[in-house]
Amino acid sequence: PDLVIGFSNLQADIAASLIRAGVEVHIFNQRSISQVLNMIAVTGALVGATEKAAQLIATLEKILDEARQSASKFTIKPKVYFEEWDDPMMCSIRWAMELIELAGGTDCFPELSNFHSAKDRIVTSQQVVERQPDIIIGSWCGKKFQPEQVMSRERWADLSAVKHGFVREIKSADILQPGPSLITHGLKQIQAIIQEWQRFQAELV
């Protein structure tokens, strides 16, 4: 190949082997929405598609702006626990936290989302209980989310998210791949969940 593109330190070994073999390699390490947009711009430059990349970025930025404007109408923000893995339990990576905020929610563990390594985002069942999420979103990377398993955890039956049926799945392909899909698919699903929660709250008044 003329160029190999990879992502994160997880591909460091194979990248090193390719470099030693004389292959040109570019490894991205995007963890935020702004870094994802920059990755698209750089990829466009690397493959001679700068204009197409700029058009895609403009489309994605429009989606982000529309989500931001829609969320500005909400007077209350639900607390959202995003679970990336179940054993051990891992909370949201930075871009997932940012998407939750954009859609009008508050991430339960924003202080952990900035950590690059998943092991630094491990949480306990008790910590989640203490944060009292209104919404639980599961996106177990590479395997099917099991809401019944989540709801059966000790003391989770008393959580608002469980009592009111706001334990939901977003497919990992839609939100955990660090590219356009987390905006075109992931964000829109988070918006739909939060908008449903807002309607539910309005009915309680």
Segments predicted by a language model, with ranges:
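Binding-cleft/active-site segments that stabilize strongly anionic ligands or cofactors
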Residues: 1-34, 63-184, 188, 196-205
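Residues in soluble alpha-helical coiled-coils and helical-bundle/repeat scaffolds
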Residues: 9, 48-51
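Helix-loop "lid/cap" segments that line or gate small-molecule binding pockets
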Residues: 40-48
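Mid-sequence helix-capping/hinge segment at a functional interface
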Residues: 50-70
